[in-house]
Amino acid sequence: MAIQLRVFYLVPLLLASYVQTTPRLEKMKMDCYKDVKGTIYNYEALSLNGKERIPFKQYAGKHVLFVNVATYCGLTIQYPELNALQDDLKQFGLVILGFPCNQFGKQEPGDNTEILPGLKYVRPGKGFLPNFQLFAKGDVNGEKEQEIFTFLKRSCPHPSETVVTSKHTFWEPIKVHDIRWNFEKFLVGPNGVPVMRWFHQAPVSTVKSDILAYLNQFKTI
């Protein structure tokens, strides 16, 4: 099975060396708007195995990190780092949720049943499995974007002022608050309201430091 996966995904692996970059220094993080209307508890998403719709209200009281992920991206190295982040901050109420998406460089080409084997045998490989919830593959931008991402993007300005025009992106219409690439992140507070948003190039170590600083106000660390 591992050999078959390696052959089938040769082209996506070649594309994985491409990570969207910008010619100038970008902000890594932006705080979300203070007048956000609504919460994530109004939404739900389909689990990766397609067997259940998971309502986000089940995460009430938790600090939730939403991440759009891809298996064959140069940033897929963040997967093990996200596992470590989940392990380190779970005791403080952090929950990570991953949303596979194929809109950036076509770097999540498989169907839902192929995503976990791709992670386990190809990239990162070596038996890797995420320790956080993954949801069914879907769009995060454009006409068919998942409703939860419409809400998250509306709630938080993007750290980058550069509008997406890359030939490696696949959606319309393009909007200023759109996610720019794989592994962007949104943190939602225990009341279900978005708190901050990170650029895809922000190191997970930076994300962790920002979350720890945020958690200080709750006196949980």
UniProtKB/Swiss-Prot annotation:
<dbReference type="Pfam" id="PF00255">
    <property type="entry name" value="GSHPx"/>
</dbReference>
<comment type="similarity">
    <text>Belongs to the glutathione peroxidase family.</text>
</comment>
<dbReference type="InterPro" id="IPR029760">
    <property type="entry name" value="GPX_CS"/>
</dbReference>
<keyword id="KW-0560">Oxidoreductase</keyword>
<feature type="signal peptide">
    <location>
        <begin position="1"/>
        <end position="21"/>
    </location>
</feature>
<dbReference type="GO" id="GO:0004602">
    <property type="term" value="F:glutathione peroxidase activity"/>
</dbReference>
<dbReference type="InterPro" id="IPR036249">
    <property type="entry name" value="Thioredoxin-like_sf"/>
</dbReference>
<feature type="active site">
    <location>
        <position position="73"/>
    </location>
</feature>
<dbReference type="GO" id="GO:0005615">
    <property type="term" value="C:extracellular space"/>
</dbReference>
<dbReference type="GO" id="GO:0097524">
    <property type="term" value="C:sperm plasma membrane"/>
</dbReference>
<dbReference type="InterPro" id="IPR029759">
    <property type="entry name" value="GPX_AS"/>
</dbReference>
<keyword id="KW-0732">Signal</keyword>
<dbReference type="GO" id="GO:0034599">
    <property type="term" value="P:cellular response to oxidative stress"/>
</dbReference>
<protein>
    <recommendedName>
        <fullName>Epididymal secretory glutathione peroxidase</fullName>
        <ecNumber>1.11.1.9</ecNumber>
    </recommendedName>
</protein>
<comment type="function">
    <text>Protects cells and enzymes from oxidative damage, by catalyzing the reduction of hydrogen peroxide, lipid peroxides and organic hydroperoxide, by glutathione. May constitute a glutathione peroxidase-like protective system against peroxide damage in sperm membrane lipids.</text>
</comment>
<dbReference type="InterPro" id="IPR000889">
    <property type="entry name" value="Glutathione_peroxidase"/>
</dbReference>
<keyword id="KW-0964">Secreted</keyword>
<keyword id="KW-0575">Peroxidase</keyword>
